[in-house]
Amino acid sequence: MSTEILGDTIDIHGGGADLEFPHHTNEIAQSEAKTGKTFANYWTHNGFVNIDNVKVSKSLGNFITVHDALETIDGQVLRFFFATQHYRKPINFTEKAVRDAETNLKYLKNTYEQPFTGTVDAQELQAFKDKFVAAMDEDFNTANGITVVFEMAKWINSGNYDVAVKEALAAMLEVFGIVFVEEVLDEEIEALIQKRQEARANRDFATADQIRDQLAAQGIKLLDTKDGVRWTRDWCQSH
């Protein structure tokens, strides 16, 4: 099936650490005996997820789905939490670990929202960029990549405010799917909500949906209730 869809050689082949032997060993033997070509260029075997230091197991019923986790955890916080761990190592999912991830992400957002109006040493900035790339080139070492991000954030907060630095910070975080959005004034939000309500009253649902999407892109969640529209502001936006 894989060779039919992806060709004789797959670029990246993933799977759980428990599949490395004998499952993937057999895949290699069978495929390369048939094609005479390398079956996969890179293998990414992920570690297991533990919850409160207990291995996740269907028989124990101690698992949680991503869908359920997102009911109480911001998507970017969850993504950031996983990025702080190397994918090959076991991950211990705990309430404290998630809270720590949220606190650390807020620190990075506060750093990002500083007024970047100064100048910096271009060579110092390039050194951070090179260090980040080197970390990610080391077997997708997101944990080390995040460490570099925090090192640069500390450097920024010591007075190195420049637009180029802000762009570099944003580019690094975007590698992990983390995108911060600019704040929207409450008056602007209320005005757009009123415009959406008028569009709905006129059965102009296309405009109403467009406004909802516009607000969502700015980190504003709308909730239609029998008492009217309620809205909440996400401190970071999930992409």
Feature-to-residue mapping (PLM):
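Structural preference for alpha-helix termini/caps and helix-kink/transition segments
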Residues: 55-239
